UniProtKB/Swiss-Prot annotation:
The gene is dnaK. Belongs to the heat shock protein 70 family. It comes from the Bacteria. This is Chaperone protein DnaK. Residues 599-610 have a biased composition (Basic and acidic residues). NCBIfam families: PRK00290.1 (NF001413), prok_dnaK (TIGR02350). Keywords: ATP-binding, Chaperone, Nucleotide-binding, Phosphoprotein, Stress response. The modification Phosphothreonine is found at T173. Acts as a chaperone. It comes from Staphylococcus aureus (strain bovine RF122 / ET3-1). PROSITE patterns: HSP70_1, HSP70_2, HSP70_3.
Amino acid sequence: MSKIIGIDLGTTNSCVTVLEGDEPKVIQNPEGSRTTPSVVAFKNGETQVGEVAKRQAITNPNTVQSIKRHMGTDYKVDIEGKSYTPQEISAMILQNLKNTAESYLGEKVDKAVITVPAYFNDAERQATKDAGKIAGLEVERIINEPTAAALAYGLDKTDKDEKVLVFDLGGGTFDVSILELGDGVFEVLSTAGDNKLGGDDFDQVIIDYLVAEFKKENGVDLSQDKMALQRLKDAAEKAKKDLSGVSQTQISLPFISAGENGPLHLEVNLTRSKFEELSDSLIRRTMGPTRQAMKDAGLTNSDIDEVILVGGSTRIPAVQEAVKKEIGKETNKGVNPDEVVAMGAAIQGGVITGDVKDVVLLDVTPLSLGIEILGGRMNTLIERNTTIPTSKSQIYSTAVDNQPSVDVHVLQGERPMAADNKTLGRFQLTDIPPAERGKPQIEVTFDIDKNGIVNVTAKDLGTNKEQRITIQSSSSLSDEEIDRMVKDAEVNAEADKKRREEVDLRNEADSLVFQVEKTLTDLGENIGEEDKKSAEEKKDALKTALEGQDIEDIKSKKEELEKVIQELSAKVYEQVAQQQQQAQGANAGQNNDSTVEDAEFKEVKDDDKK
């Protein structure tokens, strides 16, 4: 069975892994980094992903960041006259990670396990799966991030029973899950979270503070300047990271704006205590879901054996202190918060292929599922924190006499009123025979698969007529849309490949020109004028071709110069060999002509010595 890669598709950074033997390995990207920024940039028809896209975000307004926050919505990004869905942007990031894995493994990769926040709803999970398909990946499993982290943490600890709390604060989402580990079984007891809380929000409080300070000092509102805002965002992110290790940091942004008297510079000294004051409300927001997860699991603090911190934002000292205070236990420092989720995804891939044995993963649905009933209320069929996969049926009836159809409004959430919950979709069961209200028997069945994706069936028990759908919310993509996006992605991948090949060719040609110039200089008078002239002409022809856009011309001129330089090198080699032979012959002649002088010698006897 082909390799299944593990991917942590993060809000700010992503990571790709593969199982080697029984150990998950993080694959470095071409820049040598173990994580890749989840950033996509568009410039002159070219798509850039990762570090190169992030670096030019200040000057390029067509840069997309934190797209994960819009998964499962009808949000679109309009760039250069074209609209992109969150699934398409995410697919570009996934495709980049796929290419990284293929370069490392030296083989085609088409299967992956992708992680999502535990609190992702059905629409967000389906959008992630669609993104994988667009990127040319068969998504073998969608796995919750805290569960993946626990899998990576507990794989070598199957000999003991533990209850583990995973506190996952990433770039844009927050989850907390409680798991029971023992005998190779990883059972999720409860999960809670907030999909609109993460590192981006911590950056934002710093940005807001800097904007307010600058306005107070200079009377200029930087929030209205897009380029200034991007510089502030980069500076805020760096300051946040710095304050995890030092007690204060200097934020210096020269020429951030201009006033009546010339350029204006931003200089602010930010202390850790000030940052903690600014972010206090965000940290307190993480405690609500933490308490909820503990309550749902029916556990007290003394029941928790380990607290695992996941996500880059858990490096913030105030976050660590808040978790320690809430749970009353030191946090485990033995896992890398940026990589552990992707490593767990690779392990899950190994479970699927059979490379990892005796591991059973029992996850849960994070939110309750139900349908709207009379009075606009939500009737719950499957409670949150139910182990998946699962199925549940319930019988409903009509609300009025001779009702010909039933509208099934599928909901996900915890509020009592339907309008306050997330609509997953709607469908109708039609052709119900005329009858008094309350007489028809309509059986509604909810199925949740191992990926947490919902299927709903409505069946008229009187006629056995059935209507079955996989939930398609307003933000979901149709099969036709996905197919079109897959083709677009393939075309873009081919175009990107051509661009990479062109860049490589130009670099090779440029390097060849330099080498030829150096070789001609080094050889000096050891090369004939005719040969030198030929090499110079071919070299100049290649330099001229490099100034143009004709790739085939560059390729042919490069080959011509390579041929000339090879012939030249062969000639020089022969000349050097001949010179060495002549030198050796001359040395041999000198040895033969050497004169031998006669010398008298006298034998000395031992008696003469005395």
